[in-house]
Each structure stands twice: as C-alpha cells, then as structure tokens.
Amino acid sequence: MSELTALTIAEARDKLKAKAITATELTDAYLSAIDAANDAINAYVAVTHDQARSMAKASDERIAKGEAGALEGIPLGVKDLFATKGVHTQACSHILDGFKPEYESTVTANLWADGAVMLGKLNMDEFAMGSSNETSYYGPVKNPWRAKGSNADLVPGGSSGGSAAAVAAHLCAGATATDTGGSIRQPAAFTGTVGIKPTYGRVSRWGTVAFASSLDQAGPIARDVRDAAILMKSMASLDLKDTTSVDLPVPDYEAALGRSVKGMKIGIPREYRVDGMPGEIEELWQKGIQYLKDAGAEIVDISLPHTKYALPAYYIVAPAEASSNLARYDGVRYGLRVPGKDIADMYEQTRAAGFGKEVKRRIMIGTYVLSAGYYDAYYLRAQKVRTLIKKDFEDVFAKGVDAILTPATPSAAFSLADEVLANDPVKMYLNDIFTVTVNMAGLPGIAVPAGLNGQGLPLGLQLIGRPFEEETLFQAAHVIEQAAGRFTPAKWW
C-alpha cells in the first residue's frame, strides 16, 4: 500500500486516468496509513472513513464514464479551519466543541467539485494562532522529520502543522492550509514540503474560520511544486460571497513549470540578513541564488527599508482583528457552553474555559491596542507602517524586479515543548520574521525546500512575487526544486 501513498498528485492523477489504479484503492491506502500513523504524529483531529470511501466510489464511477474532474479521486486532508458540511470543524479550539457546519467553505467546495476525496480534518494551532502547532486543544503535532541519530520530537511549524506533517508523512496526497503571517510557508519549510500563500483575494475566505481578516489567505501544502500548482488551480476562484475576492481569470499554474527563468530579475533584500541568523541559513540562501543564476536569472540587490517594523506592526494588527473576530464565540448558539449565574457570567465562564492561553493572550493584546487611549499610538501607527511596507515592495517591483528570494525561516524545526519558547512568546513570534511582510503587503509567497542542515533537517527558501503573479513563483520555485531535489523523512512512526 505504501507505494500508492508515495505517489505525487500528478502521478496519481495519471495512473487514475489510465485506470492503472482506482480511487478506492488509493483512498484505502491513505486511510490505512492514517490509522497506523496518527497516534504517533497526531496530524488528524477527525478521519472521515465512510465519507472518503463514498467519495472515492463516486470518483471511480465518473472516471469509468469519462467524466473525471481535474482532481478526480485524489485524497486530500483539510485544515480544521475550513467549514466542511456535517463534519467536525472546530479550529482546534475547545470553544467550538461539537460544531458541525451546515455549509461548505468555498475552497473545499471547489476541491470536491473537481473530484477530490476528503480524508479528514487536520490538526492546527488553535484558531491558527501559533508557529509550532502546540496551541491545539487536541495536542501537538509531531514533525515526521527527526535530527540525525536523535529520537527527540520536533515541531512541524504552525499554524498549519497538521497539514504539513500529513503531507510529509504521506498521510494525504496534499492538504489545504491558511496563512496569516506565515502559517503555510513556515510549516512547509520545517517539513520539506512546498507551501504557497496566494495574493490576498485570489482564494476565497468564505467558510474559513477568521483569525485576522485583512491578512488571512488560504493555499495548498503539497509534496512538490507541481502538486502545489495543481491544487492552487482548483482552490482559486472568484467568489461573490467574499467581498475581497478578485475577479481575475485563474491561470493554469502547472503550465508555468519548466518555463525558462532566463532574464528574470530576482531581488535579494539586504534587510533579511538578520543578526544571529545561523550560518546554514545564509549558506542555503546563497545556494538558492546560485541555482537561479545558473538557470539564467539576473540577481540584483534590493532594499526593503521598513522590514524591521513588520513584526511589531503585525503583532498589533493581527491580534486587533482577532479580538474582534473572536468576540462572536459566546456559547449562545453553538459550541461549548459553561453555565453561569446570569448571561454575562455565562459568556465569561464559556470564554475562560473555551479559549487556550495563546488565544487569550492575543485577544487581550488586540483589545488593548483598540482601546480608546491606545488606538492612535498602536493600531493606527501599525496600519501606517503596513502602508510603508507595501510601498517598499511596490518600489522594488516598479524597478523591474520579478520576484524576491529570501530564507523562509530563521532556523530548522525546533524541539517540541521548548521551555525557552514556551516562556517567552516574543521569541516564538520571531519565527515569522521572514514571512509576515508578505501578508502585510497582501503579496503571494511560496516556500520551497532547498536543502538539509547539518542535522539532516529540511530548510526552505521563500520567493515573494508581484500581486497575482503566482505563475512566476511556481516557475522560479520549480527551478530551485529541480536543482535541490526533493526530501522525504525516514520513517520512525
């Protein structure tokens, strides 16, 4: 069965089309793999055995009739942030206990319309708040990668840790994920997978539990660049139910792969050389520069002067929006309800019991920066900084730069239950140092594995593109992937 789960989406698609395998066989292979591995990795919070089998059966019938969709019979995992009709959707929070939506998110509806099969819901940081998948009510996810000669558990990154771990461990062919400040790109880098955060407005947010509405964007995590391009084509669409959705035709992203990058101008931002950055990250960055140079790209030094303000500004804007978005969870209509002596007490008790520590911390920060005395000093100033960050990118792109190459993360995956990070949230927030600018500016960004560190752990590079030019990112990422190769963890689970 493991040879079936080793197939990429592109390979499985071809075999299904040629009737060399059936969707039912493929789905059963993944369900068996999940049942065998999930206790160890904890990537799934709900496995939809019956639904997966009936969707696979329907796929086989459509293939037999010659009516196959673009993702016909491909088994996918869904981050627990996407509404799935009649299926567990709890954003990995206690406050949404037992919630099963009566509607489907636009992203998942698009995937099912193209014939994909749902294997289940994937673990994540609670309400997508975290960089290590340790804030989930359902416990942490373990990274399928381990350092050479070590049995120590590592984090898969966050918040889409379940998505990245499931893809890396071959527990799904691909997965949906979301990115508010790096939640697709950082876990992809930590697990040797590919993750793309599309331009804001490219993929509908409808039916996705909101964290920070002006920053959130859904995208895929996949095993390679081609698979990410295939998934992205199905996920992206115009959606009138999302007022930020953009009416632009969805290109065939897969067709961009293999196109030459000759003459493409790649910017290298000097501000991304941060103090204390490990030598192996700098080395990897240089390697990526060389890969693109060898393929004919032109490398130019650029400056993004407001980069240093991005992280503090992000950790004002995102919690502010979260404090507003999470005000709706009160125990009245759905989810957890803790009785109280009156309605105000019931709200208080429910929210105290329902939200985890990190979510409470961010709600409190958000409420504080939006309060009358501090709104101008914090929130308004952060929004001004955001405008300056966006302008930095616009200026660089106006000079003819096609894409920007940076590291994806400041380190490889770190230890699960790291005490220093547990006691110092700011140190944990620094994981997003290379990724938040992309969300603040609403740009597309892709993380692609580019090598292993001295301990044998994957490291990723990030490419940042012009708005709605994801094709350029796929094109350049494919060049790096071809040069660096693909990486799969040694099985310990």
Curated annotation (Swiss-Prot):
GO molecular function ontology, one term from the record: glutaminyl-tRNA synthase (glutamine-hydrolyzing) activity
Entry superkingdom: Bacteria
Keywords, alphabetical: ATP-binding, Ligase, Nucleotide-binding, Protein biosynthesis
Keyword DNA repair: no
Extent of the signal sequence: none
GO biological process: translation
InterPro entries tied to this protein: Amidase (IPR000120), Amidase_CS (IPR020556), Amidase_dom (IPR023631), AS_sf (IPR036928), GatA (IPR004412)
Pfam assignment, any one: Amidase
Active site annotation, chain numbering: 79, 159, 183
Record-stated family: Belongs to the amidase family. GatA subfamily.
Subunit architecture: Heterotrimer of A, B and C subunits.
Function text: Allows the formation of correctly charged Gln-tRNA(Gln) through the transamidation of misacylated Glu-tRNA(Gln) in organisms which lack glutaminyl-tRNA synthetase. The reaction takes place in the presence of glutamine and ATP through an activated gamma-phospho-Glu-tRNA(Gln).
NCBIfam families: gatA (TIGR00132)
Protein name in the entry: Glutamyl-tRNA(Gln) amidotransferase subunit A
